[in-house]
Amino acid sequence: MTVKGETNFWKTLKTSLEGGEYIVSRLESYVTPGFPDCLIYNKVTGFFTIELKVINSSNKVTVSPFQIAWNMRHSLAGAKSYILVGGLPNHHVKLFHGCKTKELGQSTVDQVPGLYEGRLVDLDLSKIVSNSETP
């Protein structure tokens, strides 16, 4: 994953979500290692977090031990925590529940069950977040 790739992915996500339904903030936290990249608010779902990742040439993402710890702790406690992976073929994305962070660090993206795979423009986050439970 390159910083430029993730930055471009962030810009695409923000553009896709802006339009009144979502308030999207990108966070860079050096105080709390592992804190996800995005804090998002929707009046239906409330707050939730998304960690952005871009696949590498091996069809994997790089996940730090801090990111694994943060997402596992919070998602297993019931927090709305997700990983959104970009860079898939056909400009698709894949959304994972935060409790899948450790698996994502150990496997290829296609080996880990996700909540959604398809075009970013078709991703209905409010529906998925409202209906998802910790697997």
List each model region and its residues.
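Nucleic-acid nuclease catalytic cores
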Residues: 75-101
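Anion (oxyanion) recognition and catalysis
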Residues: 18, 72-76
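Active-site-adjacent loop/helix micro-motif of nuclease/hydrolase catalytic cores
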Residues: 56-68
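Conserved catalytic cores of phosphodiester-cleaving nucleases, focusing on short active-site segments
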Residues: 38-40, 46-57
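Beta-rich catalytic cores
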Residues: 34
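Charged phosphate-binding loop/patch that engages nucleotide di/tri-phosphates or the phosphate backbone
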Residues: 111-135
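Acidic-basic catalytic patches of nuclease active cores, encompassing PD-(D/E)XK
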Residues: 1-29, 43, 93
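Sequence/structural signature of beta-propeller domains
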Residues: 61, 96-107
